[in-house]
Amino acid sequence: MPKKIILDCDPGLDDAVAILLAHGNPEIELLAITTVVGNQTLAKVTRNAQLVADIAGITGVPIAAGCDKPLVRKIMTAGHIHGESGMGTVAYPAEFKNKVDERHAVNLIIDLVMSHEPKTITLVPTGGLTNIAMAARLEPRIVDRVKEVVLMGGGYHEGNATSVAEFNIIIDPEAAHIVFNESWQVTMVGLDLTHQALATPPILQRVKEVDTNPARFMLEIMDYYTKIYQSNRYMAAAAVHDPCAVAYVIDPSVMTTERVPVDIELTGKLTLGMTVADFRNPRPEHCHTQVAVKLDFEKFWGLVLDALERIGDPQ
């Protein structure tokens, strides 16, 4: 049986690859794409979700816009990484085939979780955690019904927005605190893992050889992303963060994990937004959080390339 997921995202260059992977893998049933302010404003990331869905040939999957600001703090976006549009220099069509659902993303998440059998839906947030926290507060019963939360965010060794805080966490640390402290199972796919998911020249050559419109789209955004990484991050290749969370849902053996307590720093002058992972022994017996540690590089990129092949050239 395919694994049912709700992809809560802020597209975003690497979010686009996450959408392609979720749509193109037969082990995933994509129930909804929900959007949240993050890499760009809510209006821009929602438009980008429509764009990627059209390019991928996605039909029948609701796209719903969510929270346009964090729970407490001022909006922080990442145009310096993802571009003014949030999608590099990609051109937009006059209109989209995929329309935006009238429901608020938080309500859609609640509706889907409450209408499906318990423990059958995995939430996969790849942006800030505002929508997920709001859903848990608005309808607390979803916490026991959700199978797992597999999120891209955080980092137990280093940050990227600051020396210790990762972007998706620091843009709404209060929301992250709520999500990590609920009783559901949480898998944190953070920078320690995603910095291993590099779009190297040999990988991009394999994407090029797929030779479809979605593959060419991926190449275009990866070219932009790589140049940003080379100039801003001083890395030779871009780290493709968000699809790592989707890949874990498809096949947990794509990465190794360690079950450790994780909490979010909310008051530190230098450490706001830090995901504090406690690796000390003995580990708590009923720990509900785990962090991703080591990526199987070939298996991960094999999943992405296979998804591109399966998507083909949608009409």
Curated annotation (Swiss-Prot):
<dbReference type="InterPro" id="IPR036452">
    <property type="entry name" value="Ribo_hydro-like"/>
</dbReference>
<feature type="binding site">
    <location>
        <position position="166"/>
    </location>
    <ligand>
        <name>substrate</name>
    </ligand>
</feature>
<comment type="function">
    <text>Catalyzes the hydrolysis of the N-glycosidic bond of commonly occurring purine and pyrimidine nucleosides into ribose and the base, but has a preference for inosine and uridine as substrates. Is not active on thymidine and 2'-deoxynucleosides. Functions in purine salvage from the blood of the host, a fundamental pathway since protozoan parasites such as C.fasciculata are incapable of de novo purine biosynthesis.</text>
</comment>
<dbReference type="GO" id="GO:0047724">
    <property type="term" value="F:inosine nucleosidase activity"/>
</dbReference>
<feature type="binding site">
    <location>
        <position position="15"/>
    </location>
    <ligand>
        <name>Ca(2+)</name>
    </ligand>
</feature>
<feature type="binding site">
    <location>
        <position position="126"/>
    </location>
    <ligand>
        <name>Ca(2+)</name>
    </ligand>
</feature>
<keyword id="KW-0378">Hydrolase</keyword>
<dbReference type="GO" id="GO:0046872">
    <property type="term" value="F:metal ion binding"/>
</dbReference>
<comment type="similarity">
    <text>Belongs to the IUNH family.</text>
</comment>
<dbReference type="InterPro" id="IPR001910">
    <property type="entry name" value="Inosine/uridine_hydrolase_dom"/>
</dbReference>
<dbReference type="GO" id="GO:0006152">
    <property type="term" value="P:purine nucleoside catabolic process"/>
</dbReference>
<dbReference type="Pfam" id="PF01156">
    <property type="entry name" value="IU_nuc_hydro"/>
</dbReference>
<feature type="binding site">
    <location>
        <position position="10"/>
    </location>
    <ligand>
        <name>Ca(2+)</name>
    </ligand>
</feature>
<feature type="binding site">
    <location>
        <position position="160"/>
    </location>
    <ligand>
        <name>substrate</name>
    </ligand>
</feature>
<comment type="pathway">
    <text>Purine metabolism; purine nucleoside salvage.</text>
</comment>
<feature type="binding site">
    <location>
        <position position="168"/>
    </location>
    <ligand>
        <name>substrate</name>
    </ligand>
</feature>
<dbReference type="GO" id="GO:0005829">
    <property type="term" value="C:cytosol"/>
</dbReference>
<dbReference type="GO" id="GO:0009117">
    <property type="term" value="P:nucleotide metabolic process"/>
</dbReference>
<feature type="binding site">
    <location>
        <position position="242"/>
    </location>
    <ligand>
        <name>Ca(2+)</name>
    </ligand>
</feature>
<dbReference type="GO" id="GO:0045437">
    <property type="term" value="F:uridine nucleosidase activity"/>
</dbReference>
<comment type="subunit">
    <text>Homotetramer.</text>
</comment>
<keyword id="KW-0326">Glycosidase</keyword>
<feature type="active site" description="Proton donor">
    <location>
        <position position="241"/>
    </location>
</feature>
<protein>
    <recommendedName>
        <fullName>Inosine-uridine preferring nucleoside hydrolase</fullName>
        <ecNumber>3.2.2.2</ecNumber>
        <ecNumber>3.2.2.3</ecNumber>
    </recommendedName>
</protein>
<keyword id="KW-0546">Nucleotide metabolism</keyword>
<dbReference type="InterPro" id="IPR023186">
    <property type="entry name" value="IUNH"/>
</dbReference>
<feature type="binding site">
    <location>
        <position position="14"/>
    </location>
    <ligand>
        <name>substrate</name>
    </ligand>
</feature>
<keyword id="KW-0479">Metal-binding</keyword>
<keyword id="KW-0106">Calcium</keyword>
<dbReference type="InterPro" id="IPR015910">
    <property type="entry name" value="I/U_nuclsd_hydro_CS"/>
</dbReference>
